[in-house]
């Protein structure tokens, strides 16, 4: 019976062949196939738009979402592939592509169970994440899973199960050392680009720090976005190893080394949803740290009224979960709670943040003091937890390494090994927002500031973002610049400016303070 079923499947596949054609349509990394409504395959299989179909060519198979089209732009005997589908399938122009129904997804029953408030275990999360990593989930499926886990819907046991499932489907690097240090910031604080300073300081002191970083999810720039302005970050594991062996560290995009492929897929859908829950955050961060071969990890927890973590209580809760899950998967997790009431540095957006980083490394007069001090404190913690400095001696060592140029030399070496230090792009369109009155800056809304920078084009447009001119506690006069919007397109500048004008003031100016 089984042999007959396989034979029937092969016969059906042979009769459901269309010619591969590259459409050039960018579907944001979701594989999509376009087929004529009146093509023989659609008619014989009863395919409709949003159907999940399996495409097979030359022994390679992927699952894609079907879009049914009318009109003559697509030939009747052609399967039009989106850019993502074309790259994933690896088909050649005109190559026969077999189109069949995708296998049923049993793991979706676990997603539905989570939607209705049920708890999931290792087996259920393992099945879901395995299907996610294999590309079997559509963006609709992914959005449902992400939403079902959002907020406080993952308890500690579920967070651990999700973390282990993410580690299981990716590669894991073994550096052959008992001590490999790392850091992560939970985010929510614009301009907090300390990693690009901490890595060269720490590695200049002899510790190994292979830093895999993420791109922005809900922020105007992730560490990988900012580093990419200065040097290539899309390195594979052999290239990453070479950089680390020669310099002691690296700053690369985690998605390019396939350490947690399921997380990279989830992040792609989390970004437009603007969702980033605690359980998913913990699983995302720690799965990548474990996969990257880290043993000791420092977590930066900025706390502020408009940061991602809004209270000391929330920071303690998140920190506790990070340490408990980290301990369960063999990581030593250390915490530092930092001030998250206002942006760090002056620039918000990849190129503007990179400019601030270079200023600190080079010790120029324009270097933001707050970015410098924050990075030194974090580097000091890592130097002490890694044994490169005695307890209480980390700050002195970090300060010396930054001041005498060793950190700048190390950063240049890392950039060179990753592909070369690049010059910074500049935005073509700027608009300065001025203070409406005289007084003191008593509040800065980090969330609105980050949103405005995103609407201006960051991080997609690397030069886009915001330059901040005033800090908390500063006294400003009416008409004095508060911040400047940077955009690479006039439409994006207008869009961001419209947002700023329609919302409550990002900078609160109080006259009687």
Swiss-Prot record:
InterPro entries to which the protein is assigned, alphabetical: Glycosyl_Trfase_fam3, Glycosyl_Trfase_fam3_N_dom, Glycosyl_Trfase_fam3_N_dom_sf, Nuc_phospho_transferase, PYNP-like_C_sf, PYNP_C, Pyrmidine_PPase_CS, Thym_Pase_Put
Q: Does the keyword Transferase apply?
A: yes
As recorded in UniProt, coiled-coil segments are: none
GO biological process terms held by the UniProt record? pyrimidine nucleobase metabolic process; pyrimidine nucleoside metabolic process
* Enzyme class, spelled out: transferase
Q: Which GO terms describe its cellular component?
A: cytosol
This protein's species is Acidovorax sp. (strain JS42)
Q: What is this protein called?
A: Putative thymidine phosphorylase 2
EC number assigned by the record: 2.4.2.4
Which branch of life, at top level? Answer: Bacteria
Gene Ontology MF term list:
1,4-alpha-oligoglucan phosphorylase activity; thymidine phosphorylase activity
Swiss-Prot/TrEMBL keywords = Glycosyltransferase, Transferase
Substrates-to-products reaction catalysed:
thymidine + phosphate = 2-deoxy-alpha-D-ribose 1-phosphate + thymine
Family label: Belongs to the thymidine/pyrimidine-nucleoside phosphorylase family. Type 2 subfamily.
């Amino acid at each position: 019976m089984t042999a007959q079923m396989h034979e029937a499947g092969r016969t059906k596949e042979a009769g459901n062949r269309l010619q591969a054609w590259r459409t050039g349509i960018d579907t944001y990394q979701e594989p999509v196939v376009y087929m004529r409504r009146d093509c023989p395959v659609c008619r014989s299989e009863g395919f409709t738009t949003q159907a999940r179909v399996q495409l097979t060519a030359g022994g390679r198979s992927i699952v894609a979402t079907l879009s049914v089209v009318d009109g003559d732009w697509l030939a009747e005997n052609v399967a039009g592939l989106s850019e993502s589908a074309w790259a994933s399938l690896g088909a050649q122009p005109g190559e026969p592509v077999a189109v069949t129904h995708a296998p049923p997804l049993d793991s979706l029953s676990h997603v539905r169970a989570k939607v209705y408030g049920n708890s999931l275990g290792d087996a259920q999360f393992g099945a879901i994440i395995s299907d996610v990593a294999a590309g079997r989930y559509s963006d609709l499926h992914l959005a449902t899973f992400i939403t079902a886990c959002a907020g406080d819907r993952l308890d500690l046991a579920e967070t651990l199960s999700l973390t282990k499932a993410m580690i299981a489907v990716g590669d894991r690097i073994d550096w052959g050392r008992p001590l490999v240090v790392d850091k992560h910031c939970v985010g929510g604080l614009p301009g907090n680009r300390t990693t690009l300073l901490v890595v060269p300081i720490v590695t200049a002191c002899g510790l190994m720090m292979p830093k895999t970083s993420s791109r922005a999810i809900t922020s105007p720039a992730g560490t990988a976005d900012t580093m990419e302005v200065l040097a290539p970050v899309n390195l594979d594991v052999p290239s990453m190893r070479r950089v680390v062996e020669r310099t002691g560290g690296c700053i690369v995009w985690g998605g390019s080394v396939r350490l947690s492929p399921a997380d990279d897929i989830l992040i792609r859908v989390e970004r437009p949803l603007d969702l980033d829950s605690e359980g998913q955050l913990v699983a995302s961060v720690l799965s990548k740290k474990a996969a990257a071969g880290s043993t000791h990890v420092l977590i930066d927890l900025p706390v502020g009224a408009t940061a991602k973590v809004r209270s000391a209580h929330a920071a303690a809760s998140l920190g506790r979960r990070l340490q408990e899950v980290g301990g369960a998967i063999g990581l030593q997790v250390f915490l530092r709670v930092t001030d998250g009431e206002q942006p760090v540095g002056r620039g918000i957006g990849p190129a503007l943040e990179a400019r601030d980083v270079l200023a600190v490394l080079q010790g120029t007069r324009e270097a933001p003091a707050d970015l410098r001090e924050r990075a030194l404190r974090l580097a000091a913690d890592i130097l002490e937890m890694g044994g490169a400095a005695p307890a209480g001696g980390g700050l002195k060592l970090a300060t010396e390494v930054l001041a005498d140029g060793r950190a700048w030399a190390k950063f240049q070496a890392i950039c060179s090994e990753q592909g070369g230090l690049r010059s910074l792009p500049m935005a073509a369109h700027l608009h300065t927002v001025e203070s409406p009155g005289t007084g003191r800056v008593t509040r800065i809304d980090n969330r609105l500031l980050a949103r405005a920078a995103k609407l201006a084009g960051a991080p997609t447009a690397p030069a886009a973002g915001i330059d901040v001119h005033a800090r908390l506690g500063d006294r400003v006069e009416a008409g004095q610049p508060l911040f400047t919007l940077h955009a690479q397109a006039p439409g994006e500048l207008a869009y961001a400016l419209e947002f700023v004008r329609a919302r409550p003031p990002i900078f609160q100016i109080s006259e009687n303070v």
